Amino acid sequence: MTVRVLQTGLHPERVDFDAPEFKRFEGLTEDKLRQANDDNVAMLREAGFDVVNVLIRNGDTPEDVVRKAMEQGPFDALLIGAGVRLVADNTLLFEGLVNLLHAAYPNARFVFNQAAETSPDDINRWFEGPEVKAPLQ
């Protein structure tokens, strides 16, 4: 069976690229974020992972959007994007998503990528490839 990945993050329209908390992502624009997300999903699929990608838009209730995506589960690996994880103003969002996902998938592994292009390797920290369902200890 193929390792199933739920990747979630902020839709580019939801990000205020001029806000101080996003200044750490130097040079990031709506187009660059959209392309990075698309490239990340493509790389994961090319590496053999089964990926469901859900992006949280303006006006969305994040937990509801993720719950809807969870209907496509179960998932083995749960990847939450840097815009959620690394921005202090999104701490409650990050906490809520972690608790929601952990309650639904207590045996899944959370994967925090170092960069979009490293996601396949980051998932492989926990799995010995896309066809191995049992996570490494």
What are the functions of these language-model segments?
Residues 13, 31-35, 116:
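The AdoMet/dcAdoMet-binding core of the Class I SAM-like
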Residues 36, 93-130:
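Ser/Thr/Gly-rich flexible loops in soluble cytosolic domains mediating phosphotransfer, phosphorylation
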Residues 1-23:
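N-terminal, charge-rich interaction modules
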Residues 64-100:
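Mid-chain, well-packed structural core segment of small domains
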Residues 23-42:
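Short catalytic helix/loop segments, enriched in acidic residues and glycine
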Residues 24-25, 47, 53, 113-137:
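Short, glycine-/small-residue-rich phosphate/pyrophosphate-handling segment
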Residues 42-61:
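Acidic/glycine-enriched edge-of-secondary-structure segments
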